[in-house]
């Protein structure tokens, strides 16, 4: 069966200094509960990895970004939201398939920041 990553909400508006929570639900448990990453993408730029193994912060990424969850339910939280956080965020699940690893992206969440 096709693996589906469902992200909610599809769009969210936040005030500067506020908090944003993005959810990612997988139709199949993520391999080893750790192969879940979060990416940030801005227009005209390649995706930037923020979180890997569900909760590990990538090098150089602000600690305002926090990842949590396991199995089929994962969350990305952004605290003390800044204008520079305006972007689209994606979860990426890695699944162990008999034919090899399979990667599936969520549909994305647009974060709009209001001053």
Curated annotation (Swiss-Prot):
UniProt region (Framework-2), positions on chain: 38-52
Segments for region (Framework-3): 60-91
Highest taxon above the source species: Eukaryota
Chain positions covered by the region annotation Complementarity-determining-3: 92-104
Keyword DNA-binding carried by entry: no
Protein name as it appears in the record: Ig kappa chain V region 3315
UniProt GO BP: adaptive immune response
Native source species: Oryctolagus cuniculus
Segments for region (Framework-1): 1-24
Gene Ontology CC annotations of this record: immunoglobulin complex
Complementarity-determining-2 as annotated region, ranges: 53-59
